[in-house]
Amino acid sequence: MPILEIKGPIDLNDPVLVIAISGWVDGGMVATRVGEHLKADGRLVAGFRPDDVFDYQSNRPSFELIDGAGTKIHWPSLTIDALKGDGSDVLVMTGNEPNAMWQEIADELAGFARTARVSKVVAVGAIPAMVAHTQETPIIVSSTDPALTPIGVPLGRLVVPAALVNVLSHQISDANGIPQVGFWAQVPHYVSGSYWPGVETVLNRLSAFLGLRVDLRGVHREATEMRSRLDEALANRPEAQQMIEELGQQASSLSPEDGANLTDEIETFLRDLGDDDTPFS
């Protein structure tokens, strides 16, 4: 029995599949927020059967209560929504990283992409890095097509633990012979919760790449407010300010060991502040 259920028509114009799911490479919840923002104007076209792909003891459903009364159970999901673009249409895969059946998910998604005539696959994610919130969010771009990779991207071999988004984008690209591009934001180690400046940067890059009109006013407002809260929290803490300024100035020239040490110092210092209202880890 297929684990991917079709929920609506998929008659689309030269669609691009964007994979933006929570999990291993979702630092600052950037992929989660990007996916939510993109699919807000979309329609559901497919979804994986939750009972087949999730272990509910580790990916638990949430129970919503209002004024003490239970109102709804929210189950983990992995779904695909469609939205109209100015040129190509867009399919957006969002949800939780499943606990099982990754290869079968990849195989069925590759078949779905073939049926929908997907022309490109775009993976979205974020990783904690030696960057400061005072900087523009750096983006790492990966691609199976050198023509789609900007000049200046480091070359060479790199082996890292794979997230489901890596598995899916690679196998769909490989099975169908279509290009795959990845946009990976680098977010500050020391910030907890959703990192809205990173969300804004990725949505800007993604909308330009897709030729998609995206209303970013709300996201820009969140990003501006978050930077202001971070600056205010540091205003009377010169030691933390100095550390973050040093991180911003030297991030590109620090050795991995020195950068890790500096980041550890910043994280420790900010955690020790003991202020529950600050947006620090």
Task: Locate the predicted segments by residue.
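Flexible, glycine/proline-enriched loop segments at strand-loop-helix junctions
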Residues: 21-25, 93-102, 151-159, 189-193
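A conserved C-terminal secondary-structure "cap"
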Residues: 191-281
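Short coil/turn connectors at secondary-structure junctions
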Residues: 12-16, 87-90, 116-119, 134-136, ...
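N-terminal short beta-loop-beta anion/metal-coordinating cradle
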Residues: 1-95
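Short, ordered loop/turn segments at secondary-structure junctions
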Residues: 50, 126-127, 188
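Internal, conserved structured core segments that host functional sites
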Residues: 88, 96-147
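Hydrophobic/aromatic beta-strand patches that form the interior of the parallel beta-sheet core
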Residues: 46, 91-93, 122, 179-184
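Catalytic cores of processing enzymes, dominated by hydrolases/peptidases
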Residues: 130-213
